[in-house]
Amino acid sequence: MAGGLRAVGACVLTVAALAVAGCGGADDAGPQDGPSTLTIYSSLPLHGVDGERSHDMVNAIKLAFQESGGKIGPLSVTYVSLDSSTPKDGTWTSDRVLDNARTAVRDLNAIAYIGDLDSAATALSLPLTNEGHILQISPSSTYDGLTRPGGSRPAEPERFYPSGQRTFGRVVAADHVQAAALVGYMKTQGVRRVALLSDRDLYGGGLAEQLAAAAPREGIQVLDRGDVDVRKRDFSDRAADVAKLDPDAFMFAGEASPGAARIYEAVAEADPRLLLFGSDAVADDAFVRSLPVAVARRMRVIAPALPPRLQPRAAREFDARFRATFGGPPVPEALQAYEATRLVLDSIRAAGGRGNDRAAVTDAFFATRDRRSVLGTYSIDRFGDTSLNTFAGDRMTRSGLVLDKVLRVKP
C-alpha cells in the first residue's frame, strides 16, 4: 500500500491535493489576528510491527484532506506526518514521540495533533501538546487515565494536563467501555470464572483494572489478577498456575506481541478447555493467525469496527474511495484516523472567525454533539470521550476473524 510521509524532513500535504507539496516547516508568520495557514500534525509509527496500519492511517488522513475542498473559509490548512518510530527500533520510541510533540508545539501555525497510536505514547506526547494548548485527538489510544480517573497510575488524568485546561479527546471508546463489552461477551459464552493477566504497559494494566471492576457486576468471578513480563520466552509455569484455578476462560490484557502469543499458547496447552479472550489490541487477523490453529479457534476478541455490511453508509463509501485511491482495503484503524481528521477540520470550521485560535478550535471539539460520521452518530463528553459504545465480538475461522456477536454497552 502507498506509504506515508516521514518524520525526517517531514513533508507537508496541502488540503488542495493528495500529494506531497514539498518539504520543510510550516509558515512561520501570519496576519496579526493569527495565522492564515494552519498545520495539522500526526504522530504514528511508520516502521516495524505497526508500520502497515500506520501507513493506512496516514493515507486516510490524506484522503480526508483531499475531500475537504482546499480551504476552510479564508484559512489554508496543511498536513505534516511525523514518524514516531525508527527502522532500527521497529516500533515507536519515547524520543521520537517527544520530538514529534515538540515539533508541533514550536510551530506557531499548528492547530491540532492526531495521535498517538498507543496509549503509552499518547501519555508522553499529551503533556507537551497540552502546554502548547494544541488540540490532540487520538484515533486509537483507549487508556482511561488519559481522560478520567480509573487509570492504573497516580495523579491521573491531571498529570497529562499541566496547563490546567483539557485539550485531548478520542474517537474510539475508552477502556471502561471496552471492558464492559468484553465482560458482556464473556457472559454470552457462559463464562463464570475468568483468569486475568496483563502485560506491564500502561494500556494493559489500565484495561485489567477496568475488567476486574466490571466482571463482578455481570456475575463473573476474577480468579487471578496478575501481570507478566512479555519479554520472557517461557510461560509454562505461569500457565500451570492459571490452570490450577480451574477457570472457564482466560483473558490477556495487553498489546499484540510475540510474548502475548506465547502466553496464549502456554495457557491453552495447560488447559485445553479454556476459552481465550482478547481486547481490540489483539483483534488482528495476522496476530490470531500466528497462533496454532487449535489455539486460534478458541480465541474470542472484540473490536470497535463492525463488518462493512453493518457500518454506516458513509463508512462503506470511505472504504470504496480508499481502495480506489490507494489500491487496497484499509485497516480498521484507518476509519478512525479519517474521522479524527474530519473532526479536526469541522472543529476549525465550527470556530468560525476564530478558526485559527487553538482555544476556540478546542472548545468547538468539546462542543461536538450528535455528530453523524463514518463511525456512527456520537457526541464528545466533558472528558473528551466519545459516546460510541458498539463493538464486534469476533471469533476465529479458517477465513480469519468473523463476527460472532454485536455488543452494545449501556450508557
Language model: regions and residue ranges:
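Extracytoplasmic ligand/sensor domains, especially the bilobed periplasmic-binding protein
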Residues: 110-225, 275-297
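Beta-alpha junction/loop-to-helix N-cap segments that form part of ligand/metal-binding clefts
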Residues: 26-31, 52-56, 71-155, 228-235, ...
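Solvent-exposed loop/turn segments at secondary-structure junctions
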Residues: 46-49, 84-88, 118-123, 141-146, ...
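Extracellular/periplasmic periplasmic-binding protein-like sensory domains
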Residues: 264-338, 351-352, 401-410
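Extracytoplasmic "Venus flytrap"
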Residues: 32-62, 68, 72, 82-94, ...
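Segments of small-molecule ligand-sensing domains
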Residues: 321-334, 345-403
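C-terminal motif of bacterial Sec signal peptides marking the signal peptidase cleavage site
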Residues: 19-22
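Bacterial N-terminal signal peptides that target proteins for export
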Residues: 1-12
